[in-house]
Amino acid sequence: MSEFPGLPQAPEYIQTLSPYVPGKPIEETRRELGLKRVVKLASNENPLGPSPRAIAAARSSLKDQHRYPDAGAYRLRHALARHHGASLSPSEFLLGNGSNEVIDLLIRTYARPGEAIATSQAAFVAYRICAQAHGVETLETPLTADLRFDLRALAEAVVRDPRVRLVFIANPNNPTGTHNTEAELRTFLSKVSQIHGRPVLVVLDYAYWEYVSAKDIPDPMKLYREFPNVVVLHTFSKVYGLAGFRVGYAIGSSELLSLCERIRMPFNLSAPALAAAEAALADRAFVRKAVQANRAGLRFWQRTLDRLKIPHWPSQGNFVLADVKRGLGLSGPEVFNLCLREGVIFRPVANYGLPDALRISVGTDAENRFGARALEKVAKGTQNGRR
């Protein structure tokens, strides 16, 4: 039955779709709670902001805003090809208004209504949202006990269900921060290279690749070169600090991505976004600075959580997942609301099937200390029997 009687009816898969819920905005929190200072450690943004070179490039482009941007993104495609090397062609890149658009384009191109994608529980919710928006089902396999993608179970699900057209694997995963090894991924890719007489498209989401320190996470370009059914996702929203510009991209075979290009809307990236992304890519010193700051921030939060006796998982991203239920006896949403009153926005992840956990993004040194004080105050309140 239509949600709005008397109006044209949308398909049921649209009517039942739960939209993406972003992290709570700073200004909204100030307004609702009457707080002067609010620190947001919720959306895995780069606390250093964009590279100064990216800001300058975007500002320089403003004088030409009466012109349409380059629909083919010639300069950025060539810059990306040089950046990733491995003799890549500019035609092996699909650019989108954030990775979300790229995910949407891949699903629209390679899955029909009634077919399916496969991923894991507690994976990036955009996979499921984009799939459902096009009448495509999402099959989710459980995480392992240590909150990693269970690639053995995922392979079995893909082999078992002939409707699966795409598989999404985030490495490392958000919101858990956990990762899968090269050996695990190679075994998985070998199993799904030909299923039911056809290859399944495997999308490796490497949004947090620049932050990775673990030695057993494979370079996605090696896997892309060896497995023609692999597509790799990257974003400028994380280490490059361009979340507000909305620039994401896929690396895949020219033949595969050319079909996505047919349905990509023209001018999907603004001229300032194109200019900022190209400049950010060239500023290697800024990226190194951001990675070093993130590692220091992760160490700070790991020490803080250890001191408060709140269990947490090793993270390869710019955030840490804390089991506040075991540590404080409160659910993730409960701790979120208590910290909100102290002016700190963390991220509850009950919508990922993790109601006992809270995701903490790394901020600046000052933001991290402010967030830690709020969490410590909540911890003391629980020890004293107060909620």
Q: In which residue ranges do the predicted regions lie?
A:
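N-terminal small-domain helix-loop-helix segment of the aminotransferase-like
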Residues: 2-98, 105
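Conserved core of the PLP fold type I
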Residues: 63-195, 208-226, 231, 277
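Structural scaffold positions in well-ordered secondary structure
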Residues: 41, 167, 205-207, 233, ...
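A short linear hydrophobic-aromatic micro-motif
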Residues: 91, 232, 308-311, 343-349
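Short acidic/glycine-enriched loop/turn segments that link adjacent beta-strands
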Residues: 73-76, 244, 316, 353-356
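Conserved PLP-binding catalytic core of the aspartate aminotransferase-like
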Residues: 143, 295, 307-342, 358, ...
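PLP-dependent aminotransferase class I/II
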Residues: 51, 72, 229-313
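PLP-dependent enzyme catalytic core of the Aspartate aminotransferase-like
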Residues: 183, 193, 334, 338-342, ...
